[in-house]
Amino acid sequence: MTGAGTPSQGKKNTTTHTKCRRCGEKSYHTKKKVCSSCGFGASAKRRDYEWQGKTGDN
């Protein structure tokens, strides 16, 4: 019977995110091949959302 306790945490030693070639952030998912910051790998367009700006900025 294995759980999600302290012994299981020692297995979490794989690198998930590496440096992105396009934006330079440490957000490029090596298994998914997609950057969570700029969207590199998923589309040619930059990842950008309306909710990213400050509230009240028009």
UniProtKB/Swiss-Prot annotation:
Instruction: Give the top-rank taxon of the lineage listed in the UniProt record for this protein.
Output: Archaea
Segment Disordered: which positions?
1-26
Note the zinc finger regions (C4-type) by start and end residue: 20-38
* Binding annotation for Zn(2+): 20, 23, 35, 38
* GO MF annotations in UniProt: rRNA binding; structural constituent of ribosome; zinc ion binding
- State the Gene Ontology BP annotations: translation
Cofactors: Zn(2+)
- Which residues lie in Polar residues bias regions? 1-17
Keywords from the named record: Metal-binding, Ribonucleoprotein, Ribosomal protein, RNA-binding, rRNA-binding, Zinc, Zinc-finger
Entry keyword Protease: no
InterPro entries given in the database record: Ribosomal_eL37, Ribosomal_eL37/eL43, Ribosomal_eL37_CS, Ribosomal_zn-bd
The free-text note explaining how the cofactor binds reads: Binds 1 zinc ion per subunit.
Q: Does the keyword Kinase apply?
A: no
Coiled-coil ranges from the UniProt annotation = none
Q: What role does it play?
A: Binds to the 23S rRNA.
**Protein family membership:** Belongs to the eukaryotic ribosomal protein eL37 family.
Q: Which NCBIfam families match?
A: PRK04179.1 (NF003214)
Q: Record's PANTHER family?
A: 60S RIBOSOMAL PROTEIN L37, RIBOSOMAL PROTEIN L37
The entry's protein name is: Large ribosomal subunit protein eL37
Q: Which gene encodes it?
A: rpl37e
